[in-house]
Amino acid sequence: MAHFGVVVGLMMILVFLVFLSSIHKVEEGHLAVYYRGGALLGGPGDPGYHIMFPFITYFRSVQTTLQTDEVKNVPCGTSGGVMIYFDRIEVVNMLTPSAVYDVVRNYTADYDKTLIFNKIHHELNQFCSSHTLQEVYIELFDQIDENLKLSLQMELNVMAPGLTIQAVRVTKPKIPEAIRRNFELMESEKTKLLIAEQRQKVVEKEAETERKKAVIEAEKVAQVAKIQYRQKVMEKETEKFISEIEDSAYLAREKAKADAEYYTAQKSADANKLKLTPQYLELIKYQAVSANNKIYFGSNIPTMFFDSSSRSRIEGKSA
């Protein structure tokens, strides 16, 4: 009876262990694909706890969020025969949940080795074999990232729709030490040349700035002189205009004065012409004689009061 209790206890422990081994957890951002006897079962499992047949069924967790795959120490031979090594290449990619089953079925759960790692090796070797070391190491190095991303994505669109490449980052390749020193020396000389060119450009820019400042100052002086000249011309024109106005006013006044004097004289002459009749002249003569206090002697005194006709008659009688 005691042995039976021990056996029952062992059986319960075994059942408990089997139950524990059948429970598994899928993390958030992952999907679980199940295999039974090496065959892929349909329908990936969502994040959370799941139960499966122990020892018969097993699962693989597949990430469906952004992940970074690293490809290390990739050899690459240039067109000149120089062997270089890319120490690390990072590929940021993401697999959509709807494409997990098809990608795993076609390329296994380690799809990144087939679709990314091998493709990186292939594309880099093709790139290096068609370019010189100078182009790979310096001139075209900034284009390697984008070229790898585009070529990877183009092939994945055909082979594994749903797997997208977000970015590719390539480190500077390792080259033979002697060549590296030559490149560094060349870059140093190039940097010195660029510095000299930039310094020359700065000097030229300063000279150009000074020239422009001188031109601006000269234009400013010329404009000021022109404004002053115009101001003087306007002042002279204003003075001339004022003088003409004053002259016109003076001439008008003088003309009016002369016209008035002429009119007065003319009217006075007309008045005198009307007033100086023979009778009036006789009256004036008598008044003048009567007002004269001088005494005259001679035979002609009586005749002074007669006119010329009377005088001629008197002289005729005397004769």
UniProtKB/Swiss-Prot annotation:
Glycosylation sites: N106
Principal subcellular localization: endoplasmic reticulum
Bridged cysteine pairs (disulfide): none
UniProt topology in membrane: Single-pass type II membrane protein
Ranges annotated as spanning the membrane: 7-23
An example Gene Ontology biological process: cholesterol metabolic process
Ranges of the Lumenal topological domain: 24-319
Residues in compartment: Cytoplasmic: 1-6
InterPro entries attached to this UniProt entry: Band_7, Band_7/SPFH_dom_sf, Erlin1/2
GO molecular function: lipid binding; ubiquitin protein ligase binding
Entries under Pfam families matching the protein: Band_7
Places the protein is found: Endoplasmic reticulum membrane
Gene3D superfamilies: Band 7 domain
Any one annotated GO CC term: endoplasmic reticulum membrane
SMART domains: PHB (SM00244)
UniProt keyword terms in alphabetical order: Cholesterol metabolism, Endoplasmic reticulum, Glycoprotein, Lipid metabolism, Lipid-binding, Membrane, Signal-anchor, Steroid metabolism, Sterol metabolism, Transmembrane, Transmembrane helix
Role, per record: Mediates the endoplasmic reticulum-associated degradation (ERAD) of inositol 1,4,5-trisphosphate receptors (IP3Rs). Involved in regulation of cellular cholesterol homeostasis by regulation the SREBP signaling pathway. Binds cholesterol and may promote ER retention of the SCAP-SREBF complex.
Entry's family note: Belongs to the band 7/mec-2 family.
Name of the protein described by the UniProt record: Erlin-1
Species the sequence originates in: Xenopus tropicalis
